[in-house]
Amino acid sequence: MVKKALVTAIAAATFASNAFADTIVKHTTLNTEVGDLAANVYLPDNVENPPVVVVTGAWTTVKEQMPATYAEHLAEQGYAAVTFDFRGWGESKDKLKQLEDPQRKIADIKAVFASLDQVDGIDASQAYGLGVCASSGYMLDAVLGNEDVVAAAAVAPWLHDRSVVNAVYGGAESVANLVQSGLRALTSDEPQIIEGASLTNQSALMYNVPYYTEKDRGLIPEWDNAFNVGSWAGWLTYDAHATAAQQDKPILLVASEAMAIPAGTHGYLDKAGDNVEAVWLENVSQFDFYDVEKDVQAATDAVVTHFQSNL
């Protein structure tokens, strides 16, 4: 097995934080091969044609949640950042709503990279990707073999394969039942939508889960707070490890043993080549990675160091 380089958080956090204090945020619509996608562009002030990072977030989320948090931190360090709403989420309209479909989302990310030439004031030839949580796998698949992308990173990676899925979702039989419910929902006459997160509704996708149920964190007006039951079919059968051995981009995984599924990151590293490295931060939970300042800053510092080494 090819040995993986493990970069320490201290060594990674060498780039000066908050080097560019002022950020300009512009709302735009990208006309892409998958349709119109609502996007926000974060531009560091007084930086001419900066490199650009496409930032994506956790499952069910919109561009104003943790993607915005990381976009702001990247802009403070001299990078432009583009966040966007996937088809059927937030401001990006589609007949299929709130569907967590990995293959659709991978296609959306690829389409955004291919449309960066529509964004003024950036250097689209220096494009990078950053996926947070569930979209880590989507981002890694979207950049594989993609000539529009230089390098990519993932923060709080949710990189599941079949074994991780079975462990998280109650075993093989439970997973099979959820997949079948998803398939039935996809073929039903009406979309089957449930609440995304709640402190009172035990049938919600994420009952009593931090961040998503907190108004000063992820429970914001822009968020759909909804989940299409049909999502189970694609989400639970998606294998983020399937392409690890073929990954051809310089990749950094910013992880912690305290996050949701560290086993998924270890498994991906075991299958990938030396171009995939990891930073392991101490005692950072999944939700801390989303918006706790010291943890977001440490993760951003590591990501920026990685991108700078691949300019």
Model-derived regions, located:
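The serine-hydrolase catalytic nucleophile loop
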Residues: W59-E72, F86
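Alpha/beta-hydrolase-fold enzymes
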Residues: L140-K215
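Short beta-strand/loop motif that positions the catalytic acidic residue
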Residues: Q247, L253-A255
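Short beta-strand element of the alpha/beta-hydrolase
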Residues: N49-A58
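N-terminal cap/lid segment of alpha/beta-hydrolase-fold proteins
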Residues: D22-E48
